[in-house]
Amino acid sequence: MPNLNQFIALGDSLTEGLSDKYPDGSYRGWADRVADEMSKQDSDFRYANLAVRGKLIEQVVADQLQVALPWMQQAQTLVTFHAGANNVLRPKFEPEQVFETYKNAVAQILDTGAKLLLFTVREV
């Protein structure tokens, strides 16, 4: 695997790290922990966690993905993407629309050449 010197995390509360607290009450989620380990491999390592709790997939794409796309072209980048869970919780959830948005977002990320790690909503 090539040296990955950049990590961009996109998504909602799962990626933001909500409910994963330090003793002082501040958040430090899985993405922060992964970034800590990745930074040990490269002194020029860069990390951006753009995830925000409560965001719908359309908001993740508009507010996070579109901002991050230019940065994905600049380095050996790992991108994580988790979105759609908050859509599922809505009364008028439209799975086909969410899936289409998800597919388009994945295609945009893959077109940059970045390495992509996907997370999905757990089946219940």
What does each model-identified segment do?
Residues 2, 63-124:
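Alpha-helical cap/lid subdomain in secreted, periplasmic
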Residues 14, 51-55, 83-84, 88:
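Cell-envelope and extracellular/periplasmic
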Residues 19-24, 59-60, 90-95:
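Short, solvent-exposed loop/turn segments at secondary-structure boundaries
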Residues 55-63:
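Structural motif
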